[in-house]
């Protein structure tokens, strides 16, 4: 990983040369858009049963979230709500839910196989503080009231490496603004990727937002996982293949509007 960081407060991210922006003619992700496959390998019989029976109980319609916010989705009540966007096999999300039983977690994953995998883990651990949304995360964020989330995690997202596909990346000016709206003051957006270009892209987009501060004072702050981080299967594969990830944390500033 070659992201350049200076060892001082609020280091500057790479410039536009590292991540050219706005040259596709579409800066912002189209609302309600999803790009990619929704189903891959055939599900096992028990996974099919869980998708048919358990997923409807844990799923919800974002349009029905009222002024009380996503915390109302959970019973027993929770102290705060966090979201993980594109949770893959669910390793990180499940570990977080088990480690923080007083927090509510929403997992967004349109990929059916990912949903099936996490449902198996939810059943095995009798987890009660996870809710699932099998759609586009930008649609969910648009339905949330202001300052209703404590954290948003985006871990090893699809980098869409081809230039003509950059508009499909989740991190866009519009989604950064939406995250600032739904995160409470001092809330965090956390991003993990082993793709240099997407890390530079994310740093550049967040740096030009007045609503976020990059929480890195030294190189170790982004080169090493934060405390308690659970490595995903993809993350372990990247390490085996010699690719080093960056772990970026951004705080939602109190001056955001």
Swiss-Prot record:
The active site is at 158. Residues 1-42 are annotated as: Disordered. Substrate binds at residues 162, 194. It comes from the Bacteria. Keywords: Methyltransferase, S-adenosyl-L-methionine, Transferase, tRNA processing. Pathway: tRNA modification; N(7)-methylguanine-tRNA biosynthesis. GO terms for molecular function: tRNA (guanine(46)-N7)-methyltransferase activity. It is an enzyme of class 2 (transferase). S-adenosyl-L-methionine binds at residues 84, 109, 136, 158. Its EC number is 2.1.1.33. It catalyses: guanosine(46) in tRNA + S-adenosyl-L-methionine = N(7)-methylguanosine(46) in tRNA + S-adenosyl-L-homocysteine. GO terms for cellular component: tRNA methyltransferase complex. Belongs to the class I-like SAM-binding methyltransferase superfamily. TrmB family. PANTHER family: 3-DEOXY-D-MANNO-OCTULOSONIC-ACID TRANSFERASE/TRNA GUANINE-N 7 - -METHYLTRANSFERASE, PENTACOTRIPEPTIDE-REPEAT REGION OF PRORP DOMAIN-CONTAINING PROTEIN. Catalyzes the formation of N(7)-methylguanine at position 46 (m7G46) in tRNA. NCBIfam families: tRNA (guanosine(46)-N7)-methyltransferase TrmB. This is tRNA (guanine-N(7)-)-methyltransferase. It comes from Nitrobacter winogradskyi (strain ATCC 25391 / DSM 10237 / CIP 104748 / NCIMB 11846 / Nb-255).
């Amino acid at each position: 990983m070659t992201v350049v960081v200076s060892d001082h407060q609020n280091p500057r991210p790479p410039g536009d040369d590292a991540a050219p922006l706005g040259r596709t003619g579409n800066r912002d992700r189209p609302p309600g858009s999803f790009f990619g496959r929704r189903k891959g390998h055939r599900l096992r019989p028990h996974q099919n049963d869980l998708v048919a029976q358990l997923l409807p109980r844990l799923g919800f319609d974002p349009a029905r979230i009222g002024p009380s916010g996503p915390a109302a989705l959970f019973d027993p009540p929770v102290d705060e709500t966090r979201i993980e966007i594109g949770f893959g096999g669910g390793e990180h999300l499940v570990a977080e839910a088990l480690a923080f039983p007083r927090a509510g977690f929403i997992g967004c994953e349109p990929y059916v196989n990912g949903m099936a995998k996490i449902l198996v883990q939810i059943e095995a651990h009798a987890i009660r503080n996870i809710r699932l949304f099998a759609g586009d995360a930008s649609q969910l964020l648009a339905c949330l009231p202001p300052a209703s989330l404590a954290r948003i995690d985006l871990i090893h997202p699809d980098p869409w490496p081809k230039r003509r596909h950059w508009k499909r990346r989740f991190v866009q000016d519009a989604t950064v603004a939406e995250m600032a709206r739904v995160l409470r003051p001092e809330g965090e957006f956390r991003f993990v990727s082993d793709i240099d270009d997407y890390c530079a892209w994310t740093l550049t987009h967040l740096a030009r937002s007045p609503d976020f501060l990059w929480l890195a004072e030294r190189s170790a702050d982004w080169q090493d996982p934060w405390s308690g981080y659970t490595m995903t299967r993809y993350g372990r594969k990247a390490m085996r293949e010699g690719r080093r990830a960056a772990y970026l944390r951004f705080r939602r500033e109190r001056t955001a509007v």
